Each structure stands twice: as structure tokens, then as C-alpha cells.
Amino acid sequence: MFSDLIANGFSHLDYKMWVLQGHFQSERNFSFSDLAAARQRLTNYRNFAALRWQKPATDMSEVRAAILEQLNNNLNSAGALAELDKAIKNNVPSNEFVEFLDEAFGLKLAESTPDISDELKAKIAERKQAKTERDFAKSDALRDEIAESGIKLLDGANEMLWQYE
């Protein structure tokens, strides 16, 4: 079975996320589409964890308490993940919060989302400047160069963020 997961491009952490999405006392039927959804959720969490290198952290103490409350309620991991899902929309984690998530869920978010190099940060700043100056050819070339390093840029109205591809 596990070799089937690997053969289909999934990792052990994708499977772990799938397991965490259900309650340990409930029976579940496995499907690759559900596993793909779990992988996407894990990707969302990784992108959330990567924000800690880009913006000031917000206070996540209430979120932490809500996650712990769910986990202390008969190990309700699905409920704990739902609390995290609500939080990722409007918050930025600290390193401490990402480490807490790794302790709670074992998803290796800190390990899989290291800070990018100073060279890449400089290229991102250069691209932002080129975009501000409306030099779209240079901006596009820099975006493509940055993408070759496995980093996707997200252009917002007031900011430019990055995430791992």
C-alpha cells in the first residue's frame, strides 16, 4: 500500500495529513482524491509557515489554545486542524508557533520551510523595484529566474510574498 502512495507521487506526510483529518476512532474509506486534498492542505500549511520569514508575526496564543483544546478533547485532530484552517487566513506565525504545530501534528513544517537565501531576497527586491518602475520585461525575467529556484511570487496590492512551489 505505501509503495502505491509513493508510486502515485505522494509522501508519508501527505498520508499523515490524511490520517489527521479524521478522528482516530472513526472508520474511513481511503481514496487518492482525498489524499490529494490532504496534500493540498499540507501545502497550504507550508505556505503559512513560510510567512514567518516575510512579515511580522501576529499573536497566535488564542489559536494555540483552541488547537490544544481540540486535541485534549479525545485527540480531536480534525477539530484542531479546523482551528488552524480558520487562523491561517489572517495571521502570520512566529517560529515558536510553527514549532508548536510540529510538536502537535508532526508535519515537519519548520524543516520544510527554511528561509530563502539572501541572494533570492535581493532578486525579489529587485523584481519589486522593476515592477514599481513598470519595467515589466525585467520584472518577468526576474520572476522566471526566481521560479527556477522553486519559489513562486505572489503579487498583492501592497506587498509581494513568496511561497515554495
Regions found by a protein language model. Give the residues of each.
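Structural preference for alpha-helix termini/caps and helix-kink/transition segments
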Residues: M1-E165
